């Protein structure tokens, strides 16, 4: 909040802090960029987070921190973009504000990018999208272990008590992460 009160000076401090970007620096700069509706600064932050994955948590947290009303145009554009990274962050932002990403979720589940599929499968359960239960069950056979885990977890949340339970049990016995 102090950075917001500081206005342009606060924004400049955040930009300077990105010389050595970490989670906190990325978070502060992203909050300022979102509040200022600065698309160039957001694009720079996306590039930083993609090249330094440890800083992504700050970017995602900023999307969850700011008022949902500040995100409406930005998230809508990201959900319909070609870039899987931006779509993944948009889905994460939606779920952090308890907003259903809409039709973009079904499209993301079928995407070739495993990180986007993983986030979409997770969001399916978080949003209670029972219409996507068949897609979650189909994703139990995904090549990616994280996709399989979130498909199973979401399918259980959506009411499946057979295939998804077995998949979660196998996941745990195999010693997989999550």
Region locations from a protein language model:
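Short, solvent-exposed linear motifs at loop/edge-of-secondary-structure regions
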Residues: 15-39
């Amino acid at each position: 909040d102090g950075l917001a009160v500081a206005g342009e000076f606060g924004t400049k401090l955040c930009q300077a802090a990105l010389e050595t970007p970490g989670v906190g620096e990325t978070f502060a700069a992203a909050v300022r960029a979102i509040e200022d509706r600065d698309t160039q600064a957001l694009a720079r932050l996306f590039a930083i987070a993609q090249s330094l994955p440890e800083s992504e948590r700050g970017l995602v947290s900023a999307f969850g921190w700011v008022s949902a009303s500040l995100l409406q145009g930005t998230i809508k554009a990201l959900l319909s973009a070609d870039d899987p990274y931006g779509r993944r962050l948009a889905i994460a932002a939606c779920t952090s504000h308890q907003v259903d990403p809409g039709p973009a979720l079904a499209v993301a589940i079928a995407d070739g990018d495993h990180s986007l599929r993983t986030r979409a499968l997770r969001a399916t359960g978080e949003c209670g999208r029972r219409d996507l239960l068949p897609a979650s069950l189909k994703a139990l056979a995904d090549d990616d272990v994280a996709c399989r885990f979130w498909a199973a977890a979401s399918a259980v949340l959506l009411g499946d008590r057979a295939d998804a339970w077995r998949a979660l049990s196998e996941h745990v016995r195999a010693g997989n992460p999550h």
